[in-house]
Regions:
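Conserved ABC ATPase "signature" region
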Residues: 191-210, 319
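P-loop NTP-binding/switch modules centered on Walker-like glycine-rich loops
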Residues: 66-69, 245, 249, 253-331
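Short catalytic/signature loops enriched in Gly
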Residues: 3-6, 19-25, 30, 87-89, ...
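A short, proline-enriched helix->beta-strand linker immediately N-terminal to the Walker B motif
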Residues: 234-238
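Conserved ABC transporter NBD signature motif
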Residues: 73-84, 125-140, 152
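Conserved ABC ATPase signature
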Residues: 214-219, 223
Length: 392
């Protein structure tokens, strides 16, 4: 597949939250919510981001839609570096451009032929065309920054976990779904009404006229989540972050919502980042998977390959927790020790070290492992599995 088919590329994404308040002096304690996360999603693909509560899944999704600022790293959507638009303050966006591009382009040993991506080459050409003037480069890229952020929101949307809290109780269903069209000034009043009616029909709220002027409290949980899906899709985004959209719904209607989302992905030609703690749901909704633990991705690849041949001890533990319908089947319990450690200033060693049944003395002395490809489209971050540390 061509690199032009990349919908999303995340490079070394990090998000730190201060874990203490100081009137004077520098904050020294940070929660490492997301720490060095990298992955790609190509056109037509959906990636399931799985892990326990607190591992950084939702924080990653909120960064992508601009609800959180990244601490460091780069977010590329459809070949465009959108990271500068994710920062609230222009000065922070300018600092990012300086560190990511200007300092690199001005390095004594910089070689333009070393630029691997089309986007990086375009950035360098722009820098050259502006006379290698750093201020002009930053001003050019940050011009109309708020407008570009609005354009980004048109391409990237989010479906939130709680359909009872994510819908304004004072707005009608029509107003909720039409609000993105109003913000982006799309269509006439009649065209908006037609578009809302169409999207409500697409998500299974039929006939649309019976839902348009009702309020959220008049709908069931499943109907509310269908409204949330309609709101996310009304602008025809290319990429949608779905944050456990079925976890708060009754079991009897979860499958219907998942089937609906898969159908809409085909009809609207879009990709999902599907956040979940349920591996069975992940398998149904995605064709790629990334397993997170304490802010790090520890295993990633084709979902069938990873689930049929898990290599990381944590992935094996997650699979062991999935219920098996056969009452006669007996599955061994995973040899996982203790509980999840606090993510405040974690040591540089492997995040899973304290609980890992494979951990050796070498694992304690070397930094957290990088993702290493162990087979076709199957990556794991484990010193022992990758052969960088001798097994016990």
């Amino acid at each position: 597949m061509s690199r032009n088919d990349l919908i999303l590329k995340i490079e070394n994404l990090q998000k730190l939250f201060p874990a203490e308040r100081r009137v004077f002096g520098k904050v020294r304690l940070f929660v490492h919510a997301v720490d060095g996360v990298s992955y790609e999603i190509e056109k037509g693909e959906s990636l399931a981001l799985v892990g326990e509560s607190g591992c950084g899944k939702t924080t990653t999704g909120k960064i992508l839609v601009g609800l959180y600022e990244p601490t460091s790293g780069r977010v590329i959507i459809e070949g465009e570096d959108v990271t500068p638009y994710l920062f609230q303050h222009k000065s922070r966006a300018g600092q990012y451009l300086k560190e990511m591009y200007i300092d690199r382009f001005n390095a004594p040993d910089f070689d333009p032929s070393s630029l691997e991506t089309e986007m990086d080459r375009k950035m360098y050409e722009l820098y050259q065309s502006l006379g290698k003037n750093s201020s002009s480069f930053v001003d050019h890229l940050l011009r109309d920054r708020s407008k570009k952020m609005i354009e980004l929101r048109r391409r990237v949307q989010m479906i939130f976990q709680d359909p009872y809290e994510s819908l304004n109780p004072r707005m009608t269903i029509y107003d909720i779904v039409a609000e993105p069209l109003n913000i982006h000034n799309i269509g006439s009043i009649k065209e908006r009404e037609e578009r809302v009616a169409q999207i409500l029909a697409d998500v299974g709220l039929t006939p649309p006229d019976t839902f348009m002027f009702r309020f959220p409290h008049e709908l069931s949980g499943g109907q509310r989540q269908r409204v949330a899906i309609a709101r996310a899709l009304i602008l025809n985004p290319t990429f949608v972050v779905a944050d456990e959209p079925t976890s708060m719904l009754d079991v009897s209607i979860r499958t219907g919502i998942m089937k609906l989302m898969m159908k809409l992905a085909d009809e609207y030609d879009m990709s999902y980042l599907y956040i979940t703690h349920d591996l069975a749901v992940a398998r149904y909704m995605a064709n790629k998977i990334a397993v997170m633990y304490l802010g790090k991705i520890i295993e990633m690849g084709d979902i069938e390959e990873v689930l049929h041949n898990p290599l990381h001890p944590y992935t094996k533990a997650l699979l062991a927790a999935v219920p098996v319908p056969d009452p006669e089947y007996r599955r061994g319990e995973p040899d996982i020790k203790g509980s999840v450690a606090k993510p405040i200033n974690p040591p540089p060693r492997c995040r899973f070290y304290d609980r890992c049944p494979l951990a050796t003395e070498e694992c304690a002395k070397i930094p957290h492992p990088q993702l290493k490809e162990v087979s076709s489209d199957h990556f794991v971050a484990c010193h022992v599995v990758a052969g960088d540390a001798k097994p016990k």
